[in-house]
Amino acid sequence: MVHSNTFAEFIGRKVNKVRWKPEDLMASTMFVTGSWDNDEDNVLELWGLSSQDEDLAKDFPPKLLDSVQQDGDVTQIRFLDNKFVAVSTDRGTVKLYRIIGENESPTVHIKEVTAWEELHSFEKGQKCCCKDIAVCNYSLATIGEDYKINIISLNTKQVHQAIEDVSSSPLTCICFLTETQVLCCNSLSQMKLWDLRVDKSDITADINNFTQNQVPLTCIAQHPSQKHFIFTGSEEGDVGVWDMRTNSLLTTMSSGDTSALTELAFHPLEPDHMFSCSFGGRLLQWSSKKSYMCRNDPGDLEYSNFWVNTDKVKTRLSVNDVIKPIYSPINSLDIQKQQLVCGADNEAIYLQKHLKL
């Protein structure tokens, strides 16, 4: 145990990505992890909690339900729904898996459905890393070290659009802004917006972070309800808030942790709570101080607008550790209902089942 209501389990592999298996009505009892930096022995693993009991101790340690070997380091994991999950690796490959069976069933397992080999490669067929993937309805977007974006139709299982030479510096992360627009970040503190309905050589917007320091953008998150607000994490630990209606940087937030942010995620139902993890081993909860809200002021912004008001961010932002710093990179986190899971380079996964919101 590392903190109140938080449990840790050492699984013997560095965890690069972790994701809850989605559930609509109840708290999920299954999650997947992807490992990295383990030579030729990296895996996608499916884990199950023993129950949905309120007593967290009864859920831990989680049970390993299935394991699938991966060709290289796992770089991203994205669920399409509660059955299908896409996994990318540093060998330029993306695979689609189906989770068959329910938790605690003796037949639960992971089955490969489709594989897209060498989506990203250099000249002469040399494989390169698929840096990130994003999912929107029936489309899958990938970016790689070859400065290329692939758009895959999940209906046909084919690459129906490939955009090359999209950046002059390494791409770091990608997300769908809308069903027909993808947004990618690079190591020069830039974001590029692509409209998939127009000619593939035309860029919709080239958005610069107008600061003197070109700090790499390392991760990206979209506001759950106000999709035009984009949040980016930087190599120096700052969070930028962008309004994609005007392609402008509204404000920058800092927690005092100057290590690179590895992931950002909003609570899906309580968007005034955002979570981050970092290379420095901190898992943080960024929240509006509700007690400071001017309830007598009918013109006061709702909680969902808190992030984009510079004055309110400065006076009402609360940043707290979810777990005690572990001083080893925390690479990934995910939130589902009131429970959070994260994975780190110390070969451990951490679970907190009762988030304080």
Predicted regions, residues:
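Blade-level signature of beta-propeller repeat domains, shared across WD40, Kelch, NHL, RCC1
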Residues: 331-357
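Canonical WD40 repeat/beta-propeller blade segments in eukaryotic WD-repeat proteins
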Residues: 13-22, 72-79, 123-135, 168-176, ...
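Beta-propeller domains
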Residues: 1-9, 26-66, 99-112
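Blade-loop segments of beta-propeller domains
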Residues: 56-82, 119
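Per-blade loop-tip surfaces of WD-repeat and WD-like beta-propellers in eukaryotic adaptors/scaffolds
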Residues: 49-60, 96-117, 144-171, 177-181, ...
